[in-house]
Swiss-Prot record:
Residue span of region Disordered: 472-572, 741-799
GO molecular function annotations of the record: GTPase activator activity
Signal peptide as annotated in the record: none
UniProt-recorded name of the protein: Rho GTPase-activating protein gacI
């Protein structure tokens, strides 16, 4: 071998070594990437497994939570979350499989194949080089040519392998990012499906917590300066909050023996100490701890003044000031007849001569009842107790030195909102407050007649915000006149009136009721009274209809069971002997103008306020289940499967969607998709089903919005029908999906045994034979279907 050949050989060897070394470097980097990706891939598989474990834990929790007595839909939420977690598991598992198929395995195989080829080429070249060096001179030329040819081939092999490794590296990296892109797209798709459910669950929990916060009993952080409804709501199982009940029991005993109650102020330190005790929620124990009775009356006045709104607003009582003014004019001429008139009061339109001085009492009572009926229930309850205490103090005014005039000055402004926009000169005039004070005096005088004489043992409704507001009914008098008890002169008598204790010999009151009804509070007709009709009286029969009564015969009042307290013929005398007034049964006369109907509102219960939460649960379930049915549309492969889902939508539409549409008189806004006869039948079925899903959700959303805009306090027939329709639709969808899942399991088993596959509804088993026959049979009934079905079936007429 000459020098030139050896030099050329060395150069080629150097090129081969350089390429070989580069290949080894490429392989090292690629191997590192491949190993790291394999670890990441295993992590994704592990995350998929962990997600499945989380889903199983949630499912177990949801099954156990079904036995919990919770208003929060924890069972349904956990069940749905388990499904979401399984979806996430599938997404991670899918990513791991993509990385395995597109990245780690191809890269690993490329490294193995190319590295093996390079090593084989190098080994072959090395063996040939050794044989050439040992060959004889006769074969040297031939061996040299063979070696050079192999050397070129090996170099070309190295170059090809290097290029293959580089291409594989780039393609693998790009494929990995395509896998990530697919992963994130699937994640976004899954999250978009559950995002609305998540928002709805948040809304339900928020609404539930709001209701729970208003309904539950809790230790208040503040009592003074907040709404009276909130104070009553804290102890909804009691007629009065505990601190108010203790205060009134104490005042009942002490006010009749204490001079200047409500007028004399208490010391600042003792007043603040009692206020702080009330704020803390601790028992007051007034009889044992209070030395100064004026401290108790002062803290009651402080509580009343600190209310955001007075018990009676000016715009409420201002229209009744004329009643007080007219009463003052009548009293000037009828002072000597007050005792007789109070004994002969016939509430709301009595028989007798209404033009006389005593006859005006019926009108006064009616107007005062109407005034009280405009107040919220808790305002009525508190006002009654205050007026009873004032009435007691007035009865014992010789000791208390507090007659009605004094009481109207010191306590009236704490109950009735002061007259607004008074000028300085008006305040100095006594006549400015004459009607104001007279109205307060009338309320105290007639406290036992303007308030019902049944117990108020439960203030459940007071805890319900907004609805306790104006509990009214349209009536003037009760179905039978109750005896009027004398004013209580002892705690026992007052207690008997408040609790309805029939054991008291001086009272004839109904037994205590177990729950709060509208009859426990003042219920007055807002219509006008005909004071000139002297021959009729309005009474309420058992069926709730006020009929025109014939003039009652003269009655003789029975002797009172207990003697009334001593009275003097003054305008402040409110003592009333117990009498029994016998009123004959009224005759029915529907054409008389005095005929009135009572439209009593049924009491709202806690469940009435939780109805919107139940509706939100129904709405979430319906939306979710319809979405699951929609997901089956993607898997339709045959016309029969599509017709199976169409029949399912048809059943839902006929039985549930069409009634809702008729209830709302709703017209769909979503336009029908254009259809072409040239399109594939399965594709047309899918498009039709997607459109059906969209208009179904459109109607459901509109119905839900309509329900949310309705009033809880006054539920309409529309809202009741929507609630019932949603409940039934939720049940039928759950049952249908359960049937579909069972059929899927059966079909999967048949597939494993060599049978068919596919997705259909529970009606799909009855669909067989020629597709056109199915289409014809469906089209033949199009004209009799609801608009929702017609939109589906009409577009399949060419199948």
């Amino acid at each position: 071998m000459n020098i030139k050949s050896l030099r050329k050989k060395n150069i080629q060897n150097m090129d081969q070594e350089e390429v070989y070394n580069r290949i080894k470097e490429n392989v090292a980097h690629m191997d590192e990437i491949q190993r790291t990706m394999e670890k990441q891939q295993q992590t994704f598989f592990q995350m998929s497994l962990q997600s499945k474990q989380i889903a199983e834990s949630m499912k177990k929790y949801s099954m156990d939570a079904a036995y919990f007595n919770s208003r929060i839909p924890i069972t349904d939420c956990l069940s749905r979350a388990s499904e979401w977690q399984n979806s996430i598991s599938e997404v991670f598992n899918h990513l791991g499989n993509l990385l395995y198929d597109r990245t780690t395995q191809p890269l690993k195989q490329t490294i193995s194949i190319q590295l093996e080829m390079v090593k084989e080429g190098k080994k072959k070249l090395k063996n040939l080089s050794t044989d050439t060096s040992k060959s004889s001179s006769a074969n040297l030329k031939k061996d040299t040519e063979a070696f050079e040819r192999t050397q070129k081939e090996t170099l070309q092999l190295y170059n090809d392998s290097e290029l293959a490794l580089e291409n594989s590296t780039v393609q693998t990296i790009l494929s990995s990012f395509e896998s990530y892109n697919d992963f994130f797209q699937r994640g976004v798709f899954q999250m978009s499906k559950i995002k609305s459910d998540i928002d709805n669950y948040k809304k339900i929990i928020l609404e539930t917590n709001k209701v729970a916060a208003k309904l539950r009993n809790y230790v208040p952080k503040k009592t003074f300066g907040i709404k009276l409804e909130e104070v009553f709501a804290r102890e909804s199982n009691k007629p009065l909050p505990s601190f108010l009940d203790e205060i009134f029991r104490y005042l009942e005993k002490e006010s009749i023996n204490t001079e200047g109650m409500f007028r004399v102020s208490a010391g600042k330190s003792s007043l603040e100490a009692l206020q702080q005790k009330i704020e803390s929620g601790a028992p007051l124990e007034l009889s044992a701890s209070i030395i100064d009775p004026h401290c108790v009356s002062s803290v009651l006045k402080l509580f009343l003044r600190s209310l955001p709104e007075p018990l009676v607003l000016y715009n409420v009582y201002s229209k009744y000031l004329t009643v007080a003014k007219n009463n003052n004019n009548n009293n000037n001429n009828n002072n000597n007849n007050i005792s007789n008139s109070s004994s002969n009061l016939n509430i709301v339109g009595s028989s007798g001569n209404n033009n006389s001085g005593g006859g005006s009492g019926g009108t006064i009572i009616t107007e005062l009842r109407r005034l009280i009926s405009t107040l919220p229930v808790c305002n009525q309850a508190l006002l009654k107790q205050i007026l009873l205490i004032c009435s007691l103090m007035n009865q014992h005014r010789d000791v208390t030195k507090m007659d009605l005039t004094n009481l109207s000055v010191v306590i009236g402004p704490s109950i009735l909102e002061p007259i607004p926009n008074l000028k300085a000169e008006d305040i100095q005039r006594p006549e400015t407050f004459a009607d104001f004070n007279s109205l307060f005096c009338l309320l105290v005088e007639h406290v036992l007649t303007i308030f019902p004489q049944v117990s108020q043992t439960s203030m459940d409704m007071a805890s319900l915000p907004t609805t306790i507001g104006k509990l009214r009914s349209q009536s003037d008098i009760s179905s039978q006149t109750k005896p009027l008890p004398s004013l209580p002169t002892s705690p026992q008598n007052r207690s008997a009136i408040i609790t309805g204790d029939s054991s008291s010999p001086s009272l004839n009151t109904p037994p205590v009721k177990s729950s709060l009804n509208s009859s426990d509070f003042v219920i007055v007709d807002n219509g006008s009274n005909n004071n000139n009709n002297n021959n009729t009286t309005n009474t309420i029969t058992n069926n709730g209809i006020a009929d025109t009564a014939t003039p009652p015969p003269p009655t003789t009042p029975t002797a009172p069971t207990t003697p009334p307290p001593p009275t003097t013929p003054t305008s402040n005398n409110i003592a009333t002997p117990i009498i029994n007034i016998n009123i004959p049964n009224s005759s029915n006369n529907n054409n008389n103008n005095n005929t009135k109907r009572i439209n009593n509102k049924s009491n709202l219960k806690v469940d009435d306020y939780l109805t919107p939460i139940d509706m939100q649960i129904y709405y979430i379930n319906i939306s979710s289940n319809l979405g699951r049915i929609k997901s089956y549309v993607d898997d339709i492969e045959t016309v029969n499967q599509g017709i199976g889902l169409i029949k399912l939508f048809k059943k839902i539409s006929d039985d549930h969607m069409a009634p809702i549409k008729n209830i709302l008189n709703y017209k769909f806004k979503t336009e029908k998709p254009p259809m072409s006869n040239d399109e594939d039948k399965v594709l047309r079925i899918k498009r039709t089903l997607f459109y059906t899903y969209e208009i179904t959700m459109e109607l459901i959303s509109h119905a839900n919005n309509t329900f949310e805009s309705s009033s809880i306090e006054e539920p309409t027939e529309l809202s009741k029908k929507l609630e019932e329709s949603f409940k039934q639709l939720d049940t039928i969808l759950t049952d249908e999906l359960s049937n579909i899942e069972k059929q899927q399991q059966q079909q999967q088993q048949q597939t494993n045994d060599g049978g068919g596959s596919g997705i259909s509804s529970n009606t799909n088993t009855s669909i067989s034979g020629d597709n056109s026959e199915n289409g014809d049979s469906l089209n033949s009934s199009t004209s009799n279907q609801s608009p929702l079905n017609s939109s589906i079936l009409t577009q399949l007429s060419n199948q």
